Amino acid sequence: MKLRRKVYMVAGYNTISMGTGRSEFHPKKPRPDLEDYIKEAGENVLSEIGGAGNVDECVIANFIASRYNKQANLAAFFPYIDPGLTNKPCVRVEGACATGGLGLATGIKSILAETADVVLVVGVEVQNSVKAVYGADILSAAGWYKERKDGHAHFFPGKFSDRAGVYFKEYGMEKTRQAMARWYYNAIENARLCPTAQEFENSQKNLEELALTEPNPRLFVDHLNVYDCSKVSDGASAIAIVSEEGLKRCGISKKDAMEVVGLGQAEYDLTRAPEVPLRLTTTEVAVKKALDMAGISRDQLATVECHDCFTIAAIMAIEAIGFAKPGEGSEFILAGNTSREGKIPFNTTGGLIGWGHPTGATGVHQAVTIWEQLTGKAGESQVKIPARKPYAMSVNMGGDDKTLVSLVYKKC
């Protein structure tokens, strides 16, 4: 299956990923609200595409503001961004941590359906509005909430700790822990180059040594420490999805755009445990669909944004994409392949661990990061995009490998 119409992304924008680690953040002092992030991200995209009058449709991606912020009906914030968006078709989408990816997929399908030539997509989440114990309960809705009562107090860290335990037993703990620590090191080093990253100001030394801190099951989970986990984040990301007609309407050159050439979506039963805890099998399906639609192999990818909600998830994602065989993802990382100078740079602004994880924004942030890379707008975060490898991929995962969106992009 091929895309039947040219689809592009342009004018990406990220707010700061706010939370612990940023000097601006203080849990007891005023800080931006949900609508502030929506407005900042949306306005900045509109300023690059010629204004609200050029927009046909709008999509807002948000996981669960109805609990974090007691706010629903988020699509109605688009006219708040700009009165010129009043009476435009607007919709809100949700799919746990893959919400942003679903927002992108929704916009892409509007372009393909020819109901729109320009779609504004905004992903947003504000999560530092509640104490951690309540936040853990809210986030558990990304899984099957009926498991919450008998599940781990730290619901999702517990899920991926269980996966890590199985992985350690099958493939060896020492090597895997070293790779998890290296992943953390790379994430922070990349975040230090990106001014909007939550870990931009991280000045810790001996990052790998820190990341090898022994897990404390009494205080947290059995097989992960806090450095293995993405943080709680507030922020928004936005991008415009356009047709060729939309490019002309917005006055944007193709050199400032990237083309979408592959889309893969997959879903797994929320009520069922993973059949193969050692693998991200739903991720495998979505990635294959995206690569098949693009008509390329993974070896043609210049960079990848993967969903590293936990360091063990990054190792398993590398295997799911096919860069390493099952059990060999650790060696792939330890050989330097995923670093900035490596064979295939991953998560060049820090990923979920380094840049941050404002849940509904994450999939959109991945697309913005890749747009910056493929158009040469990444600043200090820029990596080489060889002429023979003009493609990139994002993989956005919701829940414990339940909701997946993978996209393949091409440099214009």
Sequence positions of predicted segments:
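Short helix-loop capping/hinge motifs at secondary-structure junctions, enriched
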Residues: 246-250
